[in-house]
């Protein structure tokens, strides 16, 4: 590794030490066996096209910019660390940061689908977070829906000439919240309310998630901004390869 790559690895390691050390808890996104089989299969099938697009997106990026491999790994580590810090919220689920906004900004939302599913598989097998039967649902909410919204918000802020740091914050913040909107809908579809159906059930899940998820989304937005500032300082060449330093971060 050259000097800049070592600095990037050092930043990622320091971040993991600061935020990744936490007591082991039996928490997860949507836990193993919680969704009926038909919903597990449906969400898995819906995720497949995005994963295929993500594979080709990463392949194209790496073939054109070999230096991007380190940053791609760092974006994956960011997702792993943040999404492993969980706060129990409702039965069968929990609240946590997602970390996917950073990868969406750097590499686009399709690439993050691959990073996300890798993280979810590791968490399901090694940490007992989430599950293999609910992998499709968790992938769709955290690794697909959230990143696409984050990317859209970031591009919209660019078009509206919003301050770059503010745009990064909003992208991570809104993407995190949207992930939980999708999760609430997934849970509501599987367990509709006896009074009011899916809509009423979704509102109930959202109401329970909100007190913990809104503060976590704010924290994720701030952390994403801090990481981007660090990358602008120590990995400007890599960001330039990805077309992200026009005018600098201001």
From Swiss-Prot:
Signal sequence extent: 1-26
Keyword set includes Nucleotide-binding: no
Recorded coiled-coil stretches: none
Principal location listed in the UniProt entry: membrane
Pathway listed: Cofactor biosynthesis; adenosylcobalamin biosynthesis
A Pfam family assignment: CbiM
Cellular compartment(s): Cell membrane
GO function terms (MF aspect): cobalt ion transmembrane transporter activity
UniProt keyword Zinc, yes or no: no
Membrane topology reported for the UniProt record: Multi-pass membrane protein
GO BP, sorted A to Z: cobalamin biosynthetic process
Gene Ontology CC terms, in alphabetical order: ATP-binding cassette (ABC) transporter complex
Keywords: Cell membrane, Cobalamin biosynthesis, Cobalt, Cobalt transport, Ion transport, Membrane, Signal, Transmembrane, Transmembrane helix, Transport
Subunit and partners: Forms an energy-coupling factor (ECF) transporter complex composed of an ATP-binding protein (A component, CbiO), a transmembrane protein (T component, CbiQ) and 2 possible substrate-capture proteins (S components, CbiM and CbiN) of unknown stoichimetry.
The family this protein is said to belong to: Belongs to the CbiM family.
Function: Part of the energy-coupling factor (ECF) transporter complex CbiMNOQ involved in cobalt import.
Name under which the protein is recorded: Cobalt transport protein CbiM
Species of the source: Lachnoclostridium phytofermentans (strain ATCC 700394 / DSM 18823 / ISDg) (Clostridium phytofermentans)
UniProt lineage: Bacteria, Bacillati, Bacillota, Clostridia, Lachnospirales
Gene: cbiM
